[in-house]
Regions:
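N-terminal amphipathic alpha-helical segments
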Residues: 1-60, 105, 336-339
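Non-catalytic, charged helical/coil tracts that couple and regulate nucleotide-powered enzyme cores
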Residues: 21, 42-55, 241-255, 299-301, ...
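Regulatory and partner-binding modules of innate immune sensors/adaptors
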Residues: 32, 38, 96-198, 205-208, ...
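Leucine-rich repeat
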Residues: 45, 52, 59, 163, ...
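Surface-exposed helical/coil interface segments that assemble multiprotein signaling complexes
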Residues: 71, 78, 84-93, 101, ...
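N-terminal flanking helix/linker immediately upstream of nucleotide/cofactor-binding cores
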Residues: 125-201, 205-221, 229-230, 240, ...
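Loop/turn-to-beta-strand initiation segments
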Residues: 272-275, 298-304
Length: 935
């Protein structure tokens, strides 16, 4: 039978029944009886869900489903509580342990009695619910009648279409060209451009496409993008603007009134040309405040506002230069292009509609009202269906019934209802985060796994299965993806889809938000997101069975809060305290037996309590950007750990090894054989070689970052890396710049390696690096290579990013014809002996971004063949000699012709470890600086 929300509960009971060594004495019969009862009820669920989706018998079916769901939660709580009470005695030892076990036997008898009694109560409740369902017409559906094969099951999840840029969702070239002209041309007076239209019309996508354009970036001195949404804090918005336009940090961080935040921002922008985007504005008062902070400085500054509210646009139009642009629904021709691109995306159809489906496709398209979000979403649903008239007619019929209600959100809900249940839970999880929240895919995988949403599959890790889940949500256009080189992936959902998520999450009590110190949670929910003060949270949760707690925007957090959570929420699986003002993690957190994910990112926690060793179910530990310097030895007991995040920096510069730090680990890391991610840890001080040898046991590792590597570790480290068959990301950082790390001993490198960062002196490039077929990002720092490396690296077929920082001491680099055919970004930094960079015609054909300098010996641009880079969009030149920079200026510079084809050219001069003065090509400020250097 197709899965339902009861399927995971039935599986859990089945596992409980068959697990060896688990004591069900006295209750096995009751557990099996309960499982059988759920299997009888499950066929009725499909009928009830179908009625809810089609709005037939809606209220009764929805109420019936809610009652079943509540009983399912009771069962889940019951099982977890029982497991905790039964297993708790397993780890006791010694005389006191024996005494405790004797006491525990008495408690175990009571636990069995309690569970038997609770099961009987649940069964009686389920009987009554089932009978009521039959009474109002629910019938068990036939096995397989509602089976919906998902795309993840049918196709390779690593489809090239999954890595499309967001702006490919809509074909907006004409509109973006018009908007760019409004930004760059026209009056010098400050102008406000309001993009108005209903949700899903493409306002944000249009604004983002133009905002990210290199020509626009080059035209303005300062840039800021602020997502406002319905919930906002004016002070926070002003701080975000200030931070993005690079106002000095001291001013931003001080406690200020609104007026005190406005004044320095206004002064800072008075002499600068700026572009600021306010996305998704709902209230008029935003503009009434912001117009005072953004001066009308006659420098050609521009402000873009996207809104669904006509009043917001009207209020912001204060002079003749201001523009209100109303976005219109798409023409049928434009809509057809997008529809086919999304619905027929695989290799068989290549974006073309089969003739037998053309009329039905047009009929479906006409129902989408010309809204690109609706078109993309419905096409995403169809992309997972068989390409048959029967399937197409079903979708058309559902669309027709929803459109009779003239509610776009109802139409978009079809894409939610089309999801199989395991994906519904994953999709609803975006509801625990704030609107427009961006989350990295690895974090999302860890949360889904911790919640038990990801089902194990043979020959695949849980993370790989979770990646398939996310990829299908992306393919269905339910999740928007922002990716850099296909490695670092940020996910978010459209604001309209977010509203749909909150609606369904609320109906099924999936998650709940507690905002502004609310004192009541209302109906019980499994997950709690706290926004702001926490003083009332413990009163609110009471003896709640909450499974996950997230904090957002919390300014005060007492130790007693975490202690209270540990005492009241015994079934907690996820505790995310990221960015909270937490100085100390209390030992009571060790009592959270079921905890699978603990995030302390960007807190001020200095040490972890030894009691953390009691968290035997912990899978994810995040202490990145904290003050933690060492993980306690008890960590090595946590054999279920899959992810350890522990990275930070002393400063923001990449120019010295001392800028990086990780956390120390005690001996025994080899016991953590389930580790998938380990970043960044330091080798055992004094036992570095032993640490390297222990790494051989981490056969499942996917991402590894090690600091304070020593030269002596080379052979042992190489042997360990060779055994890491699944490794995709590797970073090694040497303990200092004087030692030399020899990695040439590696003969069989991990075939799937796609990210390689080596922060170490090597002198000779290992010959295995050029063999890394899947490598996308290569970062070589402090290598001090004797031989020029480009001849070896040029053939890497999938390399997209290359940075050479203090990598080569020679005088010349030569990019040969046909080399680096896919490279998008190149950074050549601090190559102090470099005098010449040769670039053959046909080399670097796709290069879009180039950053180079300082090269103190390169005095004239004649030595750098920038003119060969025809695809270049962005050029940043760092701390180059005065003569070199003067030669490139448009007013009399003899080598301006070399860079005149590049849309964005900037010159950067470092004035602090992590700060640069940035000047545009030909600007008066740059020329004054160059003149001062010559005096």
């Amino acid at each position: 039978m197709a899965e339902t929300f009861l399927s995971p509960i039935i599986e859990k009971l089945t596992e409980l029944l068959i697990e060896e060594g688990f004591s069900l004495k006295g209750v096995r019969k009751e557990v099996k009886s309960l499982k059988d009862e759920l299997e009888i009820i499950e066929p009725f669920l499909k009928d009830a869900e179908a009625k809810v989706e089609k709005d037939k018998g809606f209220d009764a079916s929805k109420a019936w489903l809610r009652q079943i769901r509540e009983e399912a939660k009771r069962i889940e709580d019951l099982v977890d509580d029982y497991v905790y009470r039964i297993e708790h005695h397993r780890y006791e030892g010694g005389f006191m342990g024996a005494l405790r076990k004797a006491c525990h036997c008495i408690k175990a008898l009571k636990a069995r009695y309690d569970i038997a009694s609770e099961i009987q109560d649940i069964k009686e409740s389920l009987h009554g619910i089932k009978d009521r369902g039959v009474g109002f017409g629910l019938r068990p559906l036939e096995q397989g009648s509602s089976s919906k094969p998902t795309n993840a099951e049918r196709q390779d999840p690593r489809l090239r279409s999954l890595f499309m840029e967001e702006d490919e969702i809509v074909c907006i070239d004409d509109a973006s060209g018009e908007l760019m002209r409004m930004l760059i041309d026209g009056e010098s007076m400050r102008s406000v451009i309001s993009l108005v239209g209903q949700g899903g019309i493409g306002k944000t996508t249009l604004a983002r496409k133009v905002y990210n354009d290199e020509v626009v970036k080059a035209h303005f001195d300062c840039h800021a993008w602020i997502t406002v949404s319905q919930s906002y804090d004016m002070k926070n918005l002003l701080r975000i603007v200030s931070r993005q336009v690079r106002l000095p940090q001291r001013i931003i961080e001080e406690e200020c009134t609104i007026d005190e935040l406005i004044s320095p921002l206004q002064q800072f922008l008075q002499t600068r040309r700026y572009v600021v985007v306010f996305d998704d504005v709902w209230q008029n008062d935003i503009w009434n405040v912001m117009k005072n902070a953004l001066p009308n400085n006659n420098n050609g500054s521009r402000i873009i506002i996207t809104t669904r509210n006509d009043n917001v646009a009207a209020v912001s139009k204060e002079n003749s230069c201001d523009v209100v642009k109303r976005l219109q629904p798409w023409s049928l021709e434009m809509a057809w292009q997008l529809f086919c691109k999304k619905a027929f995306r695989n290799d068989q159809f290549e974006g073309r509609c089969p003739q037998e489906l053309e009329q039905l496709s047009y009929d479906i398209l006409c129902k989408c009202q010309g809204l690109p979000l609706v078109i993309a979403t419905i096409a995403g649903v169809l992309s997972t269906k068989q390409k048959s008239e029967f399937e197409w007619k079903n979708v058309l019929n559902n669309l027709t019934s929803e459109l009779e209600k003239t509610d776009i959100e109802k139409i978009l809900s079809l894409s939610y209802f089309d999801l199989p249940h395991h994906l519904r839970r994953c999709y609803l999880y975006f509801g625990v985060f704030p609107e427009d929240y961006r989350i990295y895919d690895n974090k999302l995988y860890g949360l889904w796994i911790a919640e038990g949403f990801v089902k194990a599959r043979s020959n695949k890790t849980l993370e790989e299965v979770a990646e398939e889940y996310l990829n299908e949500l992306i393919q269905r256009n339910l999740v928007l993806l922002e990716t850099k080189y296909g490695i670092s992936r940020e996910c978010r959902v459209h604001d309209l889809m977010y509203e749909i998520i909150l609606t369904h999450a609320g109906e099924w009590r999936f998650c709940k938000s507690l905002k502004g110190g609310m004192s009541s949670l209302g109906e019980r929910s499994s997950r709690l997101s706290v926004y702001g003060p926490t003083e009332n949270v413990l009163k609110t949760v009471g003896d709640s069975r909450i499974r996950s707690v997230f904090l957002f925007g919390t300014n005060e957090l007492s130790k007693s809060f975490v202690v209270g959570l540990s005492e009241k929420c015994k079934l907690l699986k996820v505790l995310d305290l990221s960015n909270a003002p937490l100085d100390n993690l209390p030992k009571e957190v060790g009592n959270l037996f079921h905890l699978r994910c603990l995030r302390l990112r960007r807190t001020k926690v200095k040490t972890l309590p030894k009691s953390i060793g009691k968290l035997r179910n912990l899978q994810t530990l995040d202490v990145s950007h904290t003050l933690v310097q060492e993980l306690p030895v008890e960590i090595n007991k946590l054999i279920n750990l899959r992810h350890i995040f522990a990275y930070s920096k002393y400063g923001k510069s990449d120019f010295c090894l001392e800028c990086y730090r990780g956390v120390k680990m005690n001996e025994g890391i080899g016991r953590l054989e389930n580790l998938q991610i380990l970043t960044r840890v330091e080798a055992y001080p004094g036992r570095e070689v032993g640490f390297a040898k222990e790494l051989q046991k981490l056969r499942n590792i996917r991402s590894l970052s090690i600091l304070k590597v020593t030269a002596e570790m080379g052979i042992a480290l190489g042997a360990s890396i060779e055994k890491m068959d699944h490794l995709k990301e590797l970073t090694l950082t040497l303990i200092n710049e004087d030692e030399v790390l020899d990695l040439r001993c590696i003969s069989s490198p991990p075939l799937f390696l796609r990210w390689l960062q080596l922060n170490c002196r090597m002198q000779q490039l290992p010959d295995w690096i050029p063999k890394l077929y899947n490598l996308r990002m290569l970062d070589l720092k402090f290598s001090r290579l004797v031989d020029e490396p480009l001849g070896s690296l040029k053939g890497l077929p999938n390399l997209l990013f290359l940075r050479l920082l203090q990598t080569y001491d020679g005088e010349e680099l030569h990019f040969e014809e046909g080399g680096f055919r896919k490279l998008k970004e190149l950074r050549l930094v601090k190559l102090e002996g470099l005098k010449v960079v040769k670039i053959d015609n046909g080399a670097l054909p796709l290069l879009e971004k180039l950053e180079f300098g300082p090269f103190p010996l390169m005095m004239e641009p004649t030595s750098f063949d920038i003119q060969q880079l025809s695809s270049l969009k962005s050029l940043e030149i760092l701390d180059m000699p005065r003569e070199f920079v003067l030669g490139l200026q448009p007013d009399g510079g003899p080598y301006y012709w070399k860079i005149q084809h590049v849309p964005s050219v900037k010159f950067c001069y470092k004035y602090r470890v992590d700060r640069h003065d940035v000047y545009k090509l030909g600007s008066s400020e740059l020329l004054r600086r160059l003149q001062a250097q010559g005096n």
